[in-house]
Amino acid sequence: MKRVSQMTALAMALGLACASSWAAELAKPLTLDQLQQQNGKAIDTRPSAFYNGWPQTLNGPSGHELAALNLSASWLDKMSTEQLNAWIKQHNLKTDAPVALYGNDKDVDAVKTRLQKAGLTHISILSDALSEPSRLQKLPHFEQLVYPQWLHDLQQGKEVTAKPAGDWKVIEAAWGAPKLYLISHIPGADYIDTNEVESEPLWNKVSDEQLKAMLAKHGIRHDTTVILYGRDVYAAARVAQIMLYAGVKDVRLLDGGWQTWSDAGLPVERGTPPKVKAEPDFGVKIPAQPQLMLDMEQARGLLHRQDASLVSIRSWPEFIGTTSGYSYIKPKGEIAGARWGHAGSDSTHMEDFHNPDGTMRSADDITAMWKAWNIKPEQQVSFYCGTGWRASETFMYARAMGWKNVSVYDGGWYEWSSDPKNPVATGERGPDSSK
């Protein structure tokens, strides 16, 4: 009898384990209303471009479900178990709380499998996902962050969403000679050396006359759509932000830069930059948008205000003064009264703003990160870093998010620290330090 009872108990235990597994596999689909009633969370498994607002088909729905998180299946091979667990913790997902996935079957299955391995037990399908366009959320200006297939389709002459209104150009931006460009670049792309838009001693933007000459050289008018990309996104963003300051109306970034194009397996070419017909008539006075670039006194005027934020886009070690972040910048510290807007692990990384594939993190994540330091969309906000690259990338993201009164303090820490009379802060501190 004892042997029988042991076998029975084992069978029951195995049955319960299987039932638990099947429950996870076959959780009943939920509508968005049902999910919200259970205080659950929706997870969008599509690439971030579609989450942000790009329709997957020409006339398809645009955006993501209300309060949905984005965990793209395409990121999973770039996320370790520890990174996924950190993502789950950051978004406050409980192992026994319901989550509902949506996307194509393959992506949903891949994300479900990883979440199950991470310990989530109540995973279902969002049965009415993307069925009501009126309730979908999206970046106000998602079109300013293009994705590889969209750009390829544009180059092929296909109909695309948010098509440029007139002439358009694709340009790679990087510092120095086009070494990597020569080996492989997006077909038809021009090349801009960042030395054409900024110069020593402080690496501030060049004069307006020099900007005019640079734009003419590359055949750019104020009404030319310019699509920029870089091996480093912030190099392209630096050029993009300066072009907007000059007056180019429609400037876009390839979200994630060159790496996303390469990962997509799209065509490339090699060789020198193409010959470009000069365009001497920019069409408007430069700068057409001077408010996008602040000088030191204008930046100083934003400090210690509740209706404004001067925002440091530097790593935490830079912010607290343990490193300057640059071999050529000796002073350490931060502008006293500046608010920390996050950046990355050091002066050459921007992980705090990137998904695992290098694309922009969700607007909800970025907004929450900034809100903790009293950086809000209704304020006048100016970003700075060491010399302008990281600040420019952040500016482009804020612009896509619909923040209306944003700019870059061009001189940044390099300029500020060069004047010993300017107040400097060091050491560990929190948001209250900027009041």
Swiss-Prot record:
UniProt-annotated binding residues for substrate: 390
TM ranges: none
GO MF entry, a single one: thiosulfate-cyanide sulfurtransferase activity
Subcellular location: Periplasm
Designated name of the protein: Thiosulfate sulfurtransferase YnjE
Organism name: Escherichia coli (strain K12)
EC number: 2.8.1.1
Xref: InterPro entries: Rhodanese-like_dom, Rhodanese-like_dom_sf, Thiosulphate_STrfase_CS, TST/MPST-like
Gene Ontology CC annotation, any one: periplasmic space
